[in-house]
Amino acid sequence: YCNFDDMKQFAAVMKKSIAAQSSGPSPVQSYASHSDNIVAVLERNLTEAPNYILNSEYNFGPYLTANEQLDRANKLYNVYKEGFGACNLTQHRYGPEYSFYIVCGFDDFDDFAKKSAKSDSIYEKSLMDEKLDIKVHSDNMLIKVMD
């Protein structure tokens, strides 16, 4: 995963990457099958690169307004933030789907178990009776491979 402060920084990184690929003997192919998502950071509390991240993606009912979808995303984000501590909330900017992403860090899988249990407890107390209109949800755990 990559983070950019703004689209100007993204453009500078991409320009350098494309120049590096075209100046070598052949372009580097790093991925087999993937999709790129450029997101807008709505709230940033994850300021250091943790060993692992939980990336949770939420799509809400298309009948909701953009503000209603944001409201639901914020409700879920608050649960993750309280349970995991440092988390980021991002929203689709460019890419294949209109989603909200909640990204939280953890040190190891013991830490994940503790933070997950805390989040589950908070969710059960605060959102079990909420109509959140979640259409699709997925989670991915990613490991940091370099600093």
Kindly give the residue locations of the regions a language model identified.
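Short S/T/G/P-rich N-terminal loop/turn motif that feeds into the first structured element of a domain
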Residues: 1-147
